[in-house]
From Swiss-Prot:
The active site is at K106. Pathway: Cofactor biosynthesis; thiamine diphosphate biosynthesis. GO terms for molecular function: thiazole synthase activity. This is Thiazole synthase. It comes from Prochlorococcus marinus (strain MIT 9515). It catalyses: [ThiS sulfur-carrier protein]-C-terminal-Gly-aminoethanethioate + 2-iminoacetate + 1-deoxy-D-xylulose 5-phosphate = [ThiS sulfur-carrier protein]-C-terminal Gly-Gly + 2-[(2R,5Z)-2-carboxy-4-methylthiazol-5(2H)-ylidene]ethyl phosphate + 2 H2O + H(+). Catalyzes the rearrangement of 1-deoxy-D-xylulose 5-phosphate (DXP) to produce the thiazole phosphate moiety of thiamine. Sulfur is provided by the thiocarboxylate moiety of the carrier protein ThiS. In vitro, sulfur can be provided by H(2)S. The gene is thiG. Keywords: Cytoplasm, Schiff base, Thiamine biosynthesis, Transferase. Homotetramer. Forms heterodimers with either ThiH or ThiS.
Amino acid sequence: MKEDSALIIGGKNFSSRLMVGTGKYTSAEVMVESLLNTESEIVTVAVRRVQNHQNGENLLEKIDWEKFWMLPNTAGCANADEAVRIAILGRELAKLSGQEENNFVKLEVIPDKKYLLPDPIETLKAAEILIKKDFIVLPYINADPILAKKLEEIGCSTVMPLGSPIGSGQGLLNLSNISIIIENSNIPVIIDAGIGVPSEASQAMELGADGVLINSAIALAKDPLKMAKAMNHGVRAGREAFLAGRIEKQRLASASSPFTNISKK
């Protein structure tokens, strides 16, 4: 059995491998209770939502930032220039919340309004700029092993391949490429987007992913508080299964109660 260790991103240790979002909840109260039920440590916040929404400041005030590490994201940005500008604003938001040393940014560059698929070229361009500005960059990408490796090589702190389109609840549609990314990566791999139920979160962890990021599946569940707990259990179970090591698949059956060396008397 493999020994477990902390999730380390940008030199910071985290005990939870479940990251969560703050969008789509019916109320701030439901959001906060759900966040607590996940036992997560990293919470992502859409900078533009806080910036533009009249209740944006209220969102920041509702969350106890001594319990959670803020992960500002650049959702709503269609090109690298926009993403860099919003990332800089996000760093200031983190400071306003009391996290002076927080340089984390979840990099999203999405010009596609229908399927919300990330732009690989603009993502790479933005990542290069942000790394030079001392950001801890967590880029959201398609399940593209070549892009993932390139982002690692330029200095990203994680890669975050999608399971399926944002909010679709379709689960992990490209297991082969996700597995290749995990196999080739020397930085944490966080599966982001598309997870709909705890079994899919567990599946991602069983593959060897270092964590998952979930928002819609919790926020839009009939009972977000219960789903938050369930996702926590799913991630933990998947991680334990990965560490334990699954049995090898084989074509033929193998009796669990063999008849060899049994007395015939």
